[in-house]
Amino acid sequence: MRYDPEKHHRRSLRLKGYDYSRPGAYFVTMCLQGREPFLEIPEVCHIVEDIWKALPQRFPTIELDEFIVMPDHIHFILHLHPDHTHRPTLSTIVGAYKSLTARAVLSHLRTRGDICGNQFWQERFYDHIICNETELFAIRSYIHKNPLNPGLL
């Protein structure tokens, strides 16, 4: 099948014209492929959390903030700090995180005998540029309350 830009074009979820390597705070949601609840498995949850905690070793210009694991998705807040020599974009950071976690989790699930295909995360992710402290506190509150109200997403 040939590529048809009219048929195969996916609308970008990123804000048009925005430089996602700019310093600032970002709220990100990533969902599992098919919304499968693999994150309910304690070992899988630990893998996802451990790789999250190690992310600043790979990207020294980031600061981790809130992070929550739900059965079929995760939320986190990430801060990008200014650095004139190394400015990864939000997509680069999220892509690396998705790749590292998918490889580790799929390997673990295969050793357990759980079949989940070759894709762990949905291809895209959702982001929100956090504009001020009030918004940051509101999103932190949302993340803290999400396990109490899993139907919020």
Where on the chain are the PLM-derived regions?
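Short catalytic/metal-binding and nucleic-acid-binding patches
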Residues: 1-153
